[in-house]
Design a protein with these regions (language model features):
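Acidic catalytic loop of the alpha/beta-hydrolase fold
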Residues: 189-193, 219-221
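An N-terminal hydrophobic leader/cap segment in hydrolases
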Residues: 1-25
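Short alpha-helix in the alpha/beta-hydrolase fold that links the catalytic acid
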Residues: 63, 171, 180, 194-203
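Catalytic histidine neighborhood in serine/cysteine hydrolases
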Residues: 199-220
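Membrane-embedded segments
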Residues: 27-104, 108, 113
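Post-His helix in hydrolase/transferase enzymes
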Residues: 222-236
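Short beta-strand/loop motif that positions the catalytic acidic residue
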Residues: 178-179, 184-190
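Primarily recognizes the serine-hydrolase "nucleophile elbow" in alpha/beta-hydrolase
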Residues: 104-108, 112-158
Length: 239
């Protein structure tokens, strides 16, 4: 119900960013696929991108092609069970996958103060979990939810989802534990995660915090000039 690794909404975009395919080892001995775009580790921050609950890395090419135009390095990791990776996706397993990506980039020579965690939809749950009580440069949350139980209630209002759903991703309980600057992005037209959830996450977040809220964006936000401009402003504020 929650994880859809085989969903394909790949639009056919060609990857214009120069990337290195890397293998990221987890503590339970899985090797996960990652794409790494290195521009300048000393001059620029490094984004670790945690994607949502559906599709492959190719589904994010349109975003990566825009990120490459910013003064930033980035690593996007594919979850276990996604993009040909072995393993079963669960809440705790994806937390381990995310931490493995952080370990990989730190072993590559990037310190916490130069790492920006970027969560997309489900990935906001991993970014929020990992950012707690740490000193990362920043956190970006695109279409965040308050908890997976809250999000599921929209689609299953007559089912006791709190009892049935094992993976709860309780972002709202963790957001206060994040000390890093936060950018929350959400569109009012989101048909999957209600816009009010993004507003609530922003309200509960500590300062410094920034928002990019739009009228017309659905769940997967348009990576247009306005959004890229907001990302650029946020990244520059971290220097």
């Amino acid at each position: 119900m929650l994880y859809h690794p085989n969903e394909n909404n790949y639009s056919g975009n060609n990857l214009s960013a120069e990337i290195q395919k890397v293998k990221i080892k987890t503590s339970d001995n899985l090797e996960l696929l990652g794409w790494f775009h290195e521009k300048d580790l000393e001059k620029f921050k490094t984004i670790i991108f945690f994607h949502g609950n559906a599709g492959t890395l190719e589904n994010r090419i349109y975003k990566l092609n825009r990120l490459k135009d910013l003064d930033v390095n980035f690593l996007i990791i594919a979850w276990r069970g996604f993009s040909g990776n072995q393993g079963k996706p669960t809440e705790n397993n994806l937390y381990e996958d995310g931490r493995s990506a952080v370990r990989w980039i730190k072993n590559y020579g990037v310190e916490d103060e130069n790492i920006v965690l970027y969560g997309e939809s489900l990935g906001t749950g991993i970014a929020t979990e990992i950012a707690q009580n740490n000193n990362f440069a920043g956190v970006i949350l695109e279409t965040p939810f308050t908890s997976m139980v809250d999000a599921a209630k929209k689609f299953y209002p007559y089912i006791p989802v709190k009892l049935l759903l094992r993976d709860k991703y309780e972002n709202i309980k963790k957001i206060k534990n994040i000390r890093s600057p936060i950018l929350v992005m959400h569109g009012e037209a989101d048909q999957i995660v209600p816009f009010a959830m993004g507003q609530k996450i922003f309200q509960e977040a500590n300062n410094p915090k920034f928002s990019y809220f739009t009228k017309n964006d659905d769940h997967m936000m348009e990576f247009d000039e306005k959004l890229i401009g907001q990302l650029n402003l946020f990244l520059k504020s971290l220097n």
